Amino acid sequence: MPVNDGRGDGERGGLGDANSREAVLSAEGLTKSFGKRQAVADVSFELFAGEVFGFLGPNGAGKTTTIRMLVGLARPDRGRVRIGGFDLARDFARAMAHVGSIVESPDLYGYLTGRENLLHFARMLPDGAQGRIAELARLVALEERLDDRVETYSLGMRQRLGIAQALLGAPDLLVLDEPANGLDPAGIREIRRLVRQLAAERGIAVFVSSHLLSEVEQMCDRVTIIHRGRALATGPVQELLDRSSSGATRWRVKPAARAAELLIPFAADQPEVEGEESVIARVAREKLPEAVAALVREGIEIFAVEPRAGSLEEVFLDVTGGETV
């Protein structure tokens, strides 16, 4: 959704600079109810230039409602949104002039070609948007199909055209609602590449909502986990992954079942057998030599003891009390 105007070229304020630490997007205490149902409750986060920020949660968690508040399609009951330094409620046009977005699905006309769709939306924007069409078509790898009707495009091609459309206004902030939803693995990989490129090479702040744990893990720098309308965890992806592993080690041993029994006195919780030759156990570093010696004494073959990387799935299960995405 390219958004028209409210600023001249001199009002961008350098927000496309990936080294700037001024927040491109700031959400403070966002709360929204529909009747007696509270869809979003006191959600806060910041997003910086050149960063991919993941908003992770299951369907119905409050992701789309939050996005609608971020782009002015819904008014929060409480809280505020600032974009490019402008308060969204008080200075809507100037705030939204910094934003390109796809909410739920790209707004495209199937009977028009890709080029005609981009021209249609470019005409709503300040001078210069039409001149970016060829460049954006190359960026999203659609230059060879730009003059074909959109109704002939695959879902992934439509999604990439939607991203090109959202970039027509040269935004500092790109908001994408479930951009990989329904795509095949190749399509998901292409969206991931494009999003990372926009952040790294153009300094665009990218907000991505998703329920795909592995994709958020690979695509995003930081993430907020939202569940039942509440933000349960926020932080750098790697920091959350490190927290989820919390000292867990993978023991490549044989036989695994017997090794798991022997590790019980050294482990912080019940060791978990993974197959015939693998055990996951949380053993403190200072106890590792003693644990290894105990296994060797009992004739256990030890092939390796290595730190076990965490996953966003484990983080999600931990903060939600075991509920799945």
Q: Over which residues does each language-model region extend?
A:
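ABC transporter nucleotide-binding domain
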Residues: 192-282
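Short, charged/small-residue-rich alpha-helical element at the C-terminal edge
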Residues: 246-319, 325
